[in-house]
């Protein structure tokens, strides 16, 4: 183990501390290869639910198709992703990259002023936002040129019935979702169409 890589001691047994990558292979090529080789293995987990590589590929392709076909986004358009580390994030980032979009990462803890600057500076016209942060966008929405808002909830990709219970608990019991008014917003669950 290298002393300049102290995190390596936390790697699972058999995990190399260095990967040789071909600079001509894209992130999507790597994802497709991983899906082909590890289809049923867990790619991501959150709150006790998992997504296999096969599921990530399917969901990211569905999301990419939605962005292109339903929202009309084109290669080079920018999409802001304002989410914590939840399973929707890798689906959204891989879907956006599959669609040829430029991803603008936005801290879900940003203040309205910080969010406004990030969106204006990046030129993003679409945002996928965690419901718990939607009130921040609502505060500055009229000052931005956002055309599409996609809202995701904590439980959107969790297993049934855990996802439903989690959404109810977060919003109504723990009251962790401040009120917001974004009437034209699209719900992430509605973007999951068969391709």
Predicted regions and their residues:
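Flexible, non-catalytic linker and terminal segments flanking ANL/adenylate-forming cores
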Residues: 1-24
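Conserved AMP-binding/adenylate-forming core of the ANL superfamily
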Residues: 19-23, 40-74, 80-86, 90-94, ...
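Ligand-binding pocket scaffold of soluble enzyme catalytic domains
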Residues: 20-23, 33, 101
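Conserved donor sugar-nucleotide recognition element shared by glycan-biosynthetic enzymes
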Residues: 27
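Aromatic/hydrophobic pocket-lining residues that form π-stacking "cages" and hydrophobic walls in ligand
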Residues: 31, 92, 137
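Flexible acidic/glycine-rich loop/turn elements at helix↔coil and beta-strand↔loop transitions
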Residues: 33-39
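Alpha-helix N-cap/start motif
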Residues: 75-76, 103
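Structural core segment of the AMP-binding/adenylate-forming
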Residues: 98-192
